[in-house]
């Protein structure tokens, strides 16, 4: 169970952005659009971002495209590739205030980076369990409502936990960027948005999100 400190003023300290014009994750144009968004968001925030992926191949493809572009701006990003120490990544992230990280499951919960070390979390895709996951298959075989009973609530909770990475003490601030348009096009989208600790939710195009971040950081 994800328990967030209710004494924090999440509405004032956490802004949630939902990208309204992203292609859906199963569309061919999605990955290129995500890569553009990641480059622009990291530049607007001057680093200190945590991007939480659900798929290693997608993460590595994004990293290979995004990292060289950010390097031009002296923005460093690292990736949770095969064989890389999770502890080492955590330590590096905490030690370098401007470092950004592309990560997988082990960073969705239980990772604390208070203060300016973490200025934003990006969730490219809602963390639904794969239909081929053995537990999902077993539940689906004996319950035709298994997706709504188990898969959806688990994904909602995991997203809430990821949002909780941002505000770890009373004076923390940050942005949560949700790049999965299914939050707006599918009936279950409200379950995700209603679970978030902040009610400051802005539905904008990717370009508008970047402009809003730039205004906030330059104002």
Q: What would you call each of these model-derived segments?
A:
Residues 1-219:
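ASCE RecA-like P-loop NTPase motor cores
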């Amino acid at each position: 169970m994800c328990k967030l400190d209710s004494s924090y003023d999440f509405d004032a300290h956490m802004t949630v952005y939902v990208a309204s014009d992203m292609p859906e994750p199963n569309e061919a144009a999605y990955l290129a659009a995500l890569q553009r968004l990641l480059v622009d968001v990291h530049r607007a925030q001057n680093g200190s971002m945590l991007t939480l992926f659900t798929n290693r191949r997608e993460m590595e493809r994004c990293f290979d495209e995004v990292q060289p572009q950010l390097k031009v701006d002296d923005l460093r990003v690292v990736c949770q590739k095969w064989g890389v120490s999770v502890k080492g990544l955590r330590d590096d992230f905490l030690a370098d205030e401007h470092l950004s990280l592309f990560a997988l499951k082990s960073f969705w919960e239980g990772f604390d980076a208070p203060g300016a070390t973490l200025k934003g979390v990006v969730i490219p895709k809602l963390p639904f369990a794969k239909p081929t996951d053995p537990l999902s298959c077993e539940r689906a075989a004996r319950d035709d409502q298994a997706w709504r009973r188990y898969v959806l609530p688990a994904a909602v909770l995991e997203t809430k936990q990821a949002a909780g990475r941002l505000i770890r003490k009373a004076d923390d601030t940050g942005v949560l960027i949700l790049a999965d348009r299914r939050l707006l096009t599918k009936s279950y989208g409200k379950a995700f948005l209603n679970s978030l600790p902040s009610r400051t939710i802005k539905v904008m195009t990717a370009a508008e999100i970047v402009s809003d971040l730039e205004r906030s950081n330059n104002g």
